[in-house]
Amino acid sequence: MIRNKAFVVRLYPNAAQTELINRTLGSARFVYNHFLARRIAAYKESGKGLTYGQTSSELTLLKQAEETSWLSEVDKFALQNSLKNLETAYKNFFRTVKQSGKKVGFPRFRKKRTGESYRTQFTNNNIQIGEGRLKLPKLGWVKTKGQQDIQGKILNVTVRRIHEGHYEASVLCEVEIPYLPAAPKFAAGVDVGIKDFAIVTDGVRFKHEQNPKYYRSTLKRLRKAQQTLSRRKKGSARYGKAKTKLARIHKRIVNKRQDFLHKLTTSLVREYEIIGTEHLKPDNMRKNRRLALSISDAGWGEFIRQLEYKAAWYGRLVSKVSPYFPSSQLCHDCGFKNPEVKNLAVRTWTCPNCGETHDRDENAALNIRREALVAAGISDTLNAHGGYVRPASAGNGLRSENHATLVV
C-alpha cells in the first residue's frame, strides 16, 4: 500500500545557511501577511477578494520590484507555498462558516516567533539525500542527523526552526507500507485514564500501561527556567539564552511523550486485529480545571491519532466507542447499569444485580472491547472469566444500538 510518510531529521546548518533559513522564514511570513492585507483591502473596496491566481501573479511582480527584490534571493517554493497556506486558511474559514461543528477563525497576520517553518517542493532532483547531509534548494548541502532513515519518493520538505540554533527538516515521502501478518490476538479494549495511561484487555487478561506524566515530572525545572526568563531583559543576549533553555525543556518533554505513544500504539497494532477505544474529546474534557493539566500531559488525542493512522497503514481496524456509551457504569458480566459509578472517586464497585466486583477501569476496558466487536459485526459472549453469558436485557442492561464508529 502506498502511503505518505514524514521523516524528521535534525539540521546542522553553517552560519551562512542559518542566515538564509531565517531570511526565508521571514520572507514567507512577509508574503503571507502582505497578501492577507491585500485580500482584506480588495474585499473592502469591491466586495470581492483576490483569488490564489491573482495573488500568485502579484507575487511575481513583487519579486521584480526594486524595493522587494530581496524576495527573489530565497527559495521560490517557500513563497509560493506561503500563498497556498493563505488560500487554505481562507477555504477552511468559509467552509466552517457554512457547516456546523467546530469553527475555524478568520486568517490572522503572522507574528515573528520561534516555531516558524517553510515548505519547499521536490522537482528536477533539487532535493537529494547524501551520507550525513541533505541537499535543499538555495541552501545546498546541509549537515544532518537521522537522514539514513529516509526512504521512498520525496514529495516535499518542511524546514522548521524549533528554537534559536535548533532546526529540523520534515521530509515527506511516498513509501510502500507492507501489511503486517495476522496479529497473534484478535481484539482489545483500551480504556485511557490519568493514573494509568491505558488499561488494555483481550477479554481475559489485563495490561496496565503506567502514565509517565512527563510534564508534571519536569514541572520544577520548567518553573525555574520560566522564572529565569522573566528576570531577563527582553532582547538581551541573556534573555535569548534563557528562552532557548526553556524551549529545550519543552522540546524534550514532547520528544519523550511522542516516543512513549509511538511505542504503545505500535505494540497495539502489532498485537491485535481489532482495537476498541473511546471516542475522546480532549478539548471538552480540558474544561474541567482540576483535570485540564493532567489530560494535556497525557496526550490522549495524539494517542488516538497515531493509533488510527497506523491501523490504516497496516490493515488493522479501530472501533471508537461513542462518548455517551457508559463503559464504566455497565457491569460487564450482566449488563446492569450503575449510575453511582459516574462519581470518579469510585474506583471499585460491586454489581447489585449479580454481585460481581469490578475495578472501574478494567470493567470499562472490557465493555469497550465488547462494543468494538459489536460494531465490527462480531458478537462477544465471553465474560472476563472466559465463561459464556446471555445478551443483556432491556432496561438497565446494554442498549441494542451501535455506539461505535469504525476506522479502517
From Swiss-Prot:
Function: An RNA-guided dsDNA endonuclease. When guided by an RNA derived from the right-end element of its insertion sequence element (IS), cleaves DNA downstream of the 5'-TTGAT-3' transposon-associated motif (TAM). Cleaves supercoiled and linear DNA in a staggered manner 15-21 bases from the TAM yielding 5'-overhangs. Binds reRNA, an approximately 150 nucleotide base sRNA derived from the 3' end of its own gene, the right end (RE) of the insertion sequence (IS) and sequence downstream of the IS.
NCBIfam families: guided_TnpB (NF040570), IS200/IS605 family accessory protein TnpB-like domain (TIGR01766), IS200_TnpB (NF038281)
Top class in the EC scheme: hydrolase
Active site residues per record: 191, 278, 361
Presence of keyword Mitochondrion: no
This enzyme's EC code(s): 3.1.21.-
Disulfide cysteine pairs (residue numbers): none
Biotechnology: Has been shown to cleave dsDNA in a targeted manner in human (HEK293T) cells, suggesting it could be used for genome editing.
Encoding gene per record: tnpB
Species this chain originates from: Deinococcus radiodurans (strain ATCC 13939 / DSM 20539 / JCM 16871 / CCUG 27074 / LMG 4051 / NBRC 15346 / NCIMB 9279 / VKM B-1422 / R1)
GO molecular-function terms, A-Z: DNA binding; endonuclease activity; metal ion binding; RNA binding
Name of the protein in question: RNA-guided DNA endonuclease TnpB
Note: Belongs to the IS200/IS605 insertion sequence (IS) element family, formerly called IS8301. This element is subject to strain polymorphism; in the ATCC 13939 / R1 strain genome sequenced by White there are 7 complete and 1 incomplete IS200/IS605 elements. Another R1 strain has only 1 copy of this element. Another group found 2 copies of this element in untreated R1 strains.
Assembly and binders: Monomer.
Keywords carried by this UniProt record: DNA recombination, DNA-binding, Endonuclease, Hydrolase, Metal-binding, Nuclease, RNA-binding, Stress response, Transposition, Zinc
Annotated positions binding Zn(2+): 331, 334, 351, 354
One matching Pfam family: Cas12f1-like_TNB
Outcome following mutation: residue 191 to A: No longer cleaves dsDNA
